[in-house]
């Protein structure tokens, strides 16, 4: 009997949506039943465990699950706290759910560097990671653990500064705070135990890893098609962002024009298209790539 690969995924929220979308784009189909904790793939020996995000490192570290999709910030906090999470490693960076863990303090105050936190109180939902970061820089500060609304701590005089996740910075600004130090740049990651699991799930894991890499690559890659004058081909090729060697083909009935097809592994901006047009490129098409195996 084939063993089933077990993957822990956040039960709700941005990571849940991104994780499920990734797995579906990898070709997995799930039968959704009444069980809100467990989902079973119909077409591959894969089971999902839908749990809280901060439980995922423990599920993987204990061996209850083979892999987990979790925010790097959660993994870093659990590893800083010690225990089973230290036996985990990042198998793949997934490229979504990006955020930044930052230190911030009142905009009208005197705290502007980590050194200024000496003898101060710092409120955070990431106590182990924050304490480790500050201590590694030779500073002694009191860590005040909070489970939510961290940004109000200085205003309520619970703490002098905070360490919290920041996306746009609007919440900090609304509370009169200014970020002064980046502790961690985070995104969704696929985690596993360093020791692994020696059985027939390795083949399934390798297939999913390969497909995941293809999905991630395709989301960051575009397919460009255009017609180019033969005498401007060199200049046009130089403008194609991050392109592998393009395919050059003849255009029926034209000796002075060729068709250029290229896979571009960088973002394609309007400015790029305008520059291509200026060099004589015509009929420029930029297409998304759904699946890709490099």
Curated annotation (Swiss-Prot):
Annotated control of activity: Feedback inhibited by histidine.
Purpose: Catalyzes the condensation of ATP and 5-phosphoribose 1-diphosphate to form N'-(5'-phosphoribosyl)-ATP (PR-ATP). Has a crucial role in the pathway because the rate of histidine biosynthesis seems to be controlled primarily by regulation of HisG enzymatic activity.
EC numbers: 2.4.2.17
UniProt KW keywords: Amino-acid biosynthesis, ATP-binding, Cytoplasm, Glycosyltransferase, Histidine biosynthesis, Magnesium, Metal-binding, Nucleotide-binding, Transferase
Keyword presence, Amino-acid biosynthesis: yes
Keyword set includes Magnesium: yes
Enzyme class, first EC level, given as a word: transferase
Disulfide bonds: none
Organism: Maricaulis maris (strain MCS10)
UniProt-recorded Gene Ontology molecular function terms: ATP binding; ATP phosphoribosyltransferase activity; magnesium ion binding
GO terms for biological process, alphabetical: L-histidine biosynthetic process
GO cellular component: cytoplasm
Domain of life (superkingdom): Bacteria
Pathways per UniProt: Amino-acid biosynthesis; L-histidine biosynthesis; L-histidine from 5-phospho-alpha-D-ribose 1-diphosphate: step 1/9
Catalysed reactions listed for this entry: 1-(5-phospho-beta-D-ribosyl)-ATP + diphosphate = 5-phospho-alpha-D-ribose 1-diphosphate + ATP
Protein's name according to its UniProt entry: ATP phosphoribosyltransferase
Location of the protein in the cell: Cytoplasm
Family the entry assigns: Belongs to the ATP phosphoribosyltransferase family. Long subfamily.
InterPro entries listed in its UniProt record: ATP-PRT_HisG_long (IPR020621), ATP_PRibTrfase_cat (IPR013820), ATP_PRibTrfase_HisG (IPR001348), HisG_C (IPR013115), N-reg_PII-like_a/b (IPR011322), N-reg_PII/ATP_PRibTrfase_C (IPR015867)
Gene transcribed to yield this protein: hisG
Cofactor or coenzyme needed: Mg(2+)
């Amino acid at each position: 009997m084939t063993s089933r690969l077990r993957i822990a995924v956040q039960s709700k929220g941005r990571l849940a949506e991104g994780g499920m979308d990734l797995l579906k784009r990898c070709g997995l189909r799930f039968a959704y039943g009444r069980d809100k904790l467990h989902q079973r793939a119909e077409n591959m020996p894969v089971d999902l465990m839908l749990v809280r995000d901060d439980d995922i490192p423990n599920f993987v570290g204990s061996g209850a699950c083979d892999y987990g999709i979790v925010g790097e910030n959660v993994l870093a906090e659990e590893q800083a706290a010690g225990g089973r999470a230290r036996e985990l490693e990042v198998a793949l960076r997934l490229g979504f759910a990006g955020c930044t863990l930052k230190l911030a303090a009142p905009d009208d105050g005197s705290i502007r560097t980590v050194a200024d936190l000496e003898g101060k109180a710092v409120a955070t939902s990431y106590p182990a990671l924050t304490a480790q970061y500050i201590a590694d820089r030779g500073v002694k500060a009191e860590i005040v653990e909070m489970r939510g609304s961290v940004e109000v701590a200085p205003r309520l005089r619970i703490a002098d500064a905070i360490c919290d996740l920041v996306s746009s910075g609007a919440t900090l600004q609304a509370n009169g705070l200014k970020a002064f130090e980046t502790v961690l740049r985070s995104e969704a990651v696929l985690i596993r135990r360093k020791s692994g699991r020696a059985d027939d799930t390795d083949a399934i894991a390798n297939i999913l890893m390969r497909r995941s890499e293809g999905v991630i690559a395709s989301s960051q890659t575009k397919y460009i098609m255009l017609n180019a004058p033969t005498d401007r081909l060199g200049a046009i090729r130089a403008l194609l962002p991050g392109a592998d060697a393009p395919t050059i083909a003849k255009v029926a009935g034209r000796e002075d024009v060729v068709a250029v097809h290229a896979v571009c592994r960088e973002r394609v901006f309007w400015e790029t298209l305008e520059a291509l047009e200026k060099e004589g490129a015509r009929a420029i098409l930029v297409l998304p790539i759904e699946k890709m195996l490099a």
